[in-house]
From Swiss-Prot:
Phosphorylated on serines and threonines by host kinases, including human casein kinase II. The keyword Protein biosynthesis does not apply. Mn(2+) 1 binds at H41, D108, E119, I120. It comes from Influenza A virus (strain A/Hong Kong/1/1968 H3N2). The gene is PA. One of its GO terms (cellular component) is host cell nucleus. Its cofactor is Mn(2+). Binds 2 manganese ions per subunit. Plays an essential role in viral RNA transcription and replication by forming the heterotrimeric polymerase complex together with PB1 and PB2 subunits. The complex transcribes viral mRNAs by using a unique mechanism called cap-snatching. It consists in the hijacking and cleavage of host capped pre-mRNAs. These short capped RNAs are then used as primers for viral mRNAs. The PB2 subunit is responsible for the binding of the 5' cap of cellular pre-mRNAs which are subsequently cleaved after 10-13 nucleotides by the PA subunit that carries the endonuclease activity. Its EC number is 3.1.-.-. This is Polymerase acidic protein. The lineage of its organism: Viruses, Riboviria, Orthornavirae, Negarnaviricota, Polyploviricotina.
Length: 716
């Protein structure tokens, strides 16, 4: 049969059939009848289209190939024979330009005269049986069906045969000739008997041997073999059956499947209440750095040495005082803690040799700030079985918080470029195999786009702080160790730079389990006046500690310097993930890579270079109240990175729940956009599951707001 196909059909048709079989993982050496069927179908599609044009008056005309008028517009667009990605691109383009409804399955042709998609069928069985199978599969009035048989019969939707008698006769003659040629070679009977009904990809996959025996053994009760089960599944009408089963479960269960229409979804309800507050473990856009360039001091690289060197670059220290107290805390203790840090740093400088680490004196203010002796005494359960009113602590429900504009500002800032490089090329990892040449190119392009990004600074800052805190928690369990918050970068000129953001003082840290908490006090420099957005700084006590001279276009100006102080806590598992924040670079690189792969698949060549170097092209970045925001490929890289970084910085059960539940709604909306006519039951239950995750977390509230923008614009 394979030899016959190669002799009987045009080489271009044979090549397209080979590609189609390869795409579905089928072996043409084994599936020879299928190979012949695909070639026949392709040839009929091409013959259907051949010689048919539309003239300037919009009339359909038949023109032979050597006619000088062959530059007229083709009447039919051929979709069959293209790879799936390209075929869907063509279908989408036709739908966008003509307003045609998007089909669920790939059709074979589009008729520009009648403005409809056409599904061509070639059958070795009765035409009406094959027609009904096609119609049952497509379930669309907008796709026209035209079936031909090898016996000269045909059948079409509403008996509308589209083409003139002569064109159809040419197709029937060709099919009859193919049948005769096969019969002469003794191939026809095998070919005729091999046709099955309309198949899905899963049905084409034949299971044999051990896997077949396992499949037969793994069936639900009352099914003797896989064929019976398949026949049952194929004829299964889900809606009524599921409703019937659920109604047996409980009288309260009502699972009527409702159609999901453009008017069905409502916006997610965001909570009311006071504005949400900053809850990250360190300051983000409001952080201020004291920096040294080209560090070459003694002990360079030892955090405490670097910190002292950075502190010496600032000369505007003044007597600190509280400008924004913490509502519930003993604020003088925070002030005394900062004064203690300054005093003990001064003591170090007065020593002959600076130590590598510094353990703070266990003063009353630090004991209070670090919760020393505040934990309730643990009692073994066996010792209190007889206590009649034994119960857990009553815990208050968390207070609902509303979305505040500061979190969107934080995200926007994270997407921006800084004037420093925060990662070297090797942060994402070296090549392992020579095949990774393209991967290297993509990594280098991506690194160039994100190395200056503020989100990348947050990654390196997070990695440093979590590593230092976990080390100290293990090495100095009983000590109140002073940990400088440091990062390293390179300037535009390539000079090394060491930055100090502030200090952490670690509490007692006997961390046996992954979730055991170590308390710490963070003290971070900033130029942001907390009185501008006091709700953001609810958990902080803010001191004014100095005045900083800043150079600007109009000369020097003095700005007050603040210290943001708060008590916080973390655990071994959180620090472990914080140390691995570089994973965010990989995650966003993979997302960009899938975009490149999609583009390369359409163009059938690697598009990495064009993707990054075509500066004129814009890409969708995300939703906003204004609609879909577009930006350069660099902006897309930085936005994806910032999202990944914020997922790490603001990780919480609320985020986990919201991501999982909102994804279900997103998939239903996407199915609606793809014209898949989705149905749902208990949609309000899904909304409840989403909305119970919206409590007080700023990042979750912002994501919910973005989701509402997406709903608004997706369903227009």
């Amino acid at each position: 049969m394979e030899d016959f196909v190669r002799q009987c059909f045009n080489p271009m048709i044979v090549e397209l059939a080979e590609k189609a079989m390869k795409e579905y993982g089928e072996d043409l050496k084994i599936e020879t009848n299928k190979f012949a069927a695909i070639c026949t179908h392709l040839e009929v599609c091409f013959m259907y289209s051949d010689f048919h044009f539309i003239n300037e008056q919009g009339e359909s005309i038949v023109v032979e190939l050597d006619d000088p008028n062959a530059l007229l517009k083709h009447r039919f667009e051929i979709i069959e024979g293209r790879d799936r990605t390209m075929a869907w691109t063509v279908v989408n383009s036709i739908c966008n330009t003509t307003g045609a409804e998007k089909p669920k399955f790939l059709p074979d042709l589009y008729d520009y005269k009648e403005n409809r998609f056409i599904e061509i069928g070639v059958t070795r069985r009765e035409v009406h049986i094959y027609y009904l199978e096609k119609a049952n599969k497509i379930k669309s009035e907008n796709t026209h069906i035209h079936i031909f048989s090898f016996t000269g019969e045909e059948m079409a939707t509403k008996a509308d045969y589209t083409l003139d008698e002569e064109s159809r006769a040419r197709i029937k003659t060709r099919l009859f000739t193919i049948r005769q040629e096969m019969a002469n070679r003794g191939l026809w009977d095998s070919f005729r008997q091999s046709e099955r009904g309309e198949e899905t990809i899963e049905e084409r996959f034949e299971i044999t041997g051990t896997m077949r025996r396992l499949a037969d053994q793994s069936l639900p009760p009352n099914f003797s073999c896989l064929e019976n089960f398949r026949a049952y599944v194929d004829g299964f009408e889900p809606n009524g059956y599921i409703e019937g089963k659920l109604s047996q479960m409980s009288k309260e269960v009502n699972a009527k499947i409702e159609p999901f229409l453009k008017t069905t979804p409502r916006p997610i309800r965001l909570p009311d209440g006071p504005p949400c507050f900053q809850r990250s473990k360190f300051l983000l856009m409001d952080a201020l750095k004291l920096s040294i360039e080209d560090p070459s001091h003694e002990g360079e690289g030892i955090p405490l040495y670097d910190a002292i060197k950075c502190m010496r670059t600032f000369f505007g220290w003044k007597e600190p005082y509280i400008v924004k107290p913490h509502e519930k805390g003993i604020n003088p203790n925070y002030l005394l803690s900062w004064k203690q840090v300054l005093a003990e740093l001064q003591d170090i400088e007065n020593e002959e040799k600076i130590p590598r680490t510094k353990n703070m004196k266990k003063t009353s203010q630090l004991k209070w700030a670090l919760g020393e002796n505040m934990a309730p005494e643990k009692v073994d359960f066996d010792n209190c079985r007889d206590v009649s009113d034994l119960k857990q602590y009553d815990s208050d429900e968390p207070e609902l918080r509303s979305l505040s504009s500061w979190i969107q500002n934080e995200f926007n800032k994270a997407c921006e470029l800084t004037d420093s490089t925060w990662i070297e090329l090797d942060e994402i990892g070296e090549d392992v195999a020579p095949i990774e040449y393209i991967a290297s190119m993509r990594r280098n392009y991506f690194t160039a786009e994100v190395s200056h990004c503020r989100a990348t600074e947050y990654i390196m800052k997070g990695v440093y702080i979590n590593t230092a805190l976990l080390n100290a928690s293990c090495a100095a369990m009983d000590d109140f160790q002073l940990i400088p918050m440091i990062s390293k970068c390179r300037t535009k000129e390539g000079r090394r730079k060491t930055n100090l953001y502030g200090f952490i003082i670690k509490g007692r840290s006997h961390l046996r389990n992954d979730t055991d908490v170590v308390n710490f006090v963070s003290m971070e420099f900033s130029l942001t006046d907390p009185r501008l957005e006091p709700h953001k700084w609810e958990k902080y006590c803010v001191l004014e500690i100095g005045d900083m001279l800043l150079r600007s276009a109009i000369g020097q100006m003095s700005r007050p310097m603040f210290l943001y102080v708060r008590t916080n806590g973390t655990s071994k598992i959180k620090m472990k993930w914080g140390m691995e924040m570089r994973r965010c670079l990989l995650q966003s690189l993979q997302q960009i890579e899938s975009m490149i792969e999609a583009e390369s698949s359409v163009k059938e060549k690697d598009m990495t270079k064009e993707f990054f170097e075509n500066k004129s092209e814009t890409w969708p970045i995300g939703e906003s109240p204004k609609g879909v925001e577009d930006g350069s490929i660099g902006k897309v890289c930085r936005t994806l990175l910032a999202k990944s970084v914020f997922n790490s910085l603001y990780a919480s059960p609320q985020l986990e729940g919201f991501s999982a539940e909102s994804r279900k709604l997103l998939l239903v909306v996407q199915a609606l956009k793809d014209n898949l006519e989705p149905g749902t039951f208990d949609l309000e239950g899904l909304y409840e599951a989403i909305e119970e995750c919206l409590i007080n977390d700023p990042w979750v509230l912002l994501n919910a707001s973005w989701f509402n923008s997406f709903l608004t614009h997706a369903l227009r």
